[in-house]
Amino acid sequence: MPKEFIVAIELGSSKMTGIAGQKNLDGSITVLATVEEDSSSCIRKGVIYNIDKTCQCLTNIIKKLKNILKQDITQVYVGVGGRSIRSIKNVIVKDLPGNTIISQEMINELMDINRNMTYPDQEILDAATQEYKIDNQYQIDPVGIQCNHLEGIFLNILWRKNFYNNINTCFENANIPIAEMYLAPLAMADSVLTDSEKRAGCMLVDLGADTTTVSVYYKGILRHLSVIPLGGGNVTKDLTCLQIEEPDAEKMKLKYAKAYTDINNIDPTLNYPIDKDRVVESKKFIEIVEARVEEIVENAWFQIPVEFSDKLLGGIILTGGGSNMPEIDKVFKTHTHIDKVRIAKFVSQTVNSRDPKITNHDGTMNTVLGLLAKGDMNCAGDEIGTDLFSNSAEKPVAAEQHKAPRNPNETAGKGVVLTAAEKAAADEAARKQKELEEAEARLLAEKEAEEEEKRRKENSLIHKMMRGFKKFVKDTISEEE
């Protein structure tokens, strides 16, 4: 087995996926191993709710990968997503002295102020710069421009603090170091969207089991991100009204369900078998499926900010397991009135693999492959020997790689989520900077107070009388001389 590889883990609502692979010089990816664990008992709507069971799933994922790779794993890349992730705009204003030339330090200051914003029970995972307002004009890169008034417009991506803390706790308890955390929707977007689609304006919809994630890009920049707590699993749950268990409902959905069926093509005599003794009319089955699909599509379209609804020249891109439902693209065309709809069955990178989960090209592996593509540090550890009598001291050891400490501004808008350690370091740096600024402000205030006291004394009545008396004495002496 290779001595170097990258490992990524996706925390999905229906399954947890682990993948190991190598990035080749030609830009392609070679997948070395893929494993899965059922996560339905510990992750709901993409959010961890049972820490112990999640730790066990993570441990099993790593154990399976190590057995295949015959090597230890020192760290992993992790995708962050799920319910309650949302984006919110924030504007930071700075008035400048007349005709000030904007420097990179000024831009960094705006970014720092924005990053240190606080939201009740929310954590800022990332902040994507939208644009800058220079006096009355908008610019993407304002450095070097003269102005009196500077505004930074940012898109802050928020998540519940306890959800963020739970992820860090699970990996700590499972003793699995995190190489880097990424916003899963952004990692996937970079792998399935073209640069042209991002520039022209597009809507990316990831149709998952428990959630549907909507991302909007325009002029190459992320403009909106939201997660809807609805997915393909809701269709399955609706079908249980036929008095069948969820596993059987899922099988029926995969075999018979279509997102849209022309009413003229519905055969009133056609029945679908539920079990060996029961059937359901195809018309009733179709109504159940279509009602939920329409709700998901309408909710996804409702997420699009009004100012971008007419700027989606790149169209709508569908991905995820739910995009495999026949006629799903037609439903999106009908409800959004956008004819340009593409189904992204696979990532844009060339991927070498014989694993059916990869070669099926069904959209279910796009996120974890996107995470793998983001990796740039070796995750391989010691080789695991199979010879019980070999000298363990002679085993080759792979060098561990760790990223140097970074300022959050370096990765802003790229989907990189600070780990708990990085966040603690950033918070400490922000605290020290705030203390320094407060100390400077106090010194300035004290100096101004001293000058004011001096002016006050100079303008006091006694001081004026003393100055007048001194002047009188001086003038008198001059006359006598």
Language model features with spans:
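Nucleotide/phosphate-binding catalytic cleft detector across ATP-hydrolyzing
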Residues: 1-15, 19-202, 259, 307, ...
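C-terminal region/appendage detector
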Residues: 1-6, 23, 31-36, 72-75, ...
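Short amphipathic alpha-helical segments
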Residues: 20-21, 90-91, 216-218, 329-331
